[in-house]
């Protein structure tokens, strides 16, 4: 079962190259994760109030745990909402 390619050339298409994202909290002048820094924490909360996963934000696993703990602490203290309607 051989399939002939239309157009002849036989060249394969290169796959889409996706650049690997780096963690925004690693590096020399990276911001510190603090539960009082509401403006920073809001960047990692969805419009429904959920914590955005690290595969989307490119945060490392260690920093994602710190980030989620800071968001939960800020929610408990009333600095961030639990749910956004």
Curated annotation (Swiss-Prot):
Matches recorded under NCBIfam families: S18
Residues of the signal peptide: none
Gene: rpsR
Family: Belongs to the bacterial ribosomal protein bS18 family.
Gene3D superfamilies the record matches: Ribosomal protein S18 (4.10.640.10)
Compositionally biased region (Gly residues): 1-12
PANTHER family on file: 30S RIBOSOMAL PROTEIN S18, SMALL RIBOSOMAL SUBUNIT PROTEIN BS18M
Lineage: Bacteria, Pseudomonadati, Pseudomonadota, Alphaproteobacteria, Hyphomicrobiales
Function according to Swiss-Prot or TrEMBL: Binds as a heterodimer with protein bS6 to the central domain of the 16S rRNA, where it helps stabilize the platform of the 30S subunit.
A GO term from the CC aspect: cytosolic small ribosomal subunit
Keywords of the record: Ribonucleoprotein, Ribosomal protein, RNA-binding, rRNA-binding
InterPro entries per record: Ribosomal_bS18, Ribosomal_bS18_CS, Ribosomal_bS18_sf
HAMAP family referenced in this protein's UniProt entry, alphabetically: Ribosomal_bS18 (MF_00270)
Protein name: Small ribosomal subunit protein bS18
Species: Azorhizobium caulinodans (strain ATCC 43989 / DSM 5975 / JCM 20966 / LMG 6465 / NBRC 14845 / NCIMB 13405 / ORS 571)
Assembly description: Part of the 30S ribosomal subunit. Forms a tight heterodimer with protein bS6.
